[in-house]
């Protein structure tokens, strides 16, 4: 989780 949008972080998707 380096430069991932908070939108994905909230969903628990730290992998793009």
From Swiss-Prot:
Annotated protein name in UniProt: Unidentified mitochondrial matrix protein
Subcellular location: Mitochondrion matrix
Source organism (scientific name): Solanum tuberosum
Main location: mitochondrion
Organism domain of life: Eukaryota
Lineage: Eukaryota, Viridiplantae, Streptophyta, Embryophyta, Tracheophyta
Alphabetical keyword list: Mitochondrion
GO cellular component terms attached to this protein's record: mitochondrial matrix
């Amino acid at each position: 989780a380096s430069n991932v949008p908070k939108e994905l972080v909230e969903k628990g998707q730290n992998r793009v």
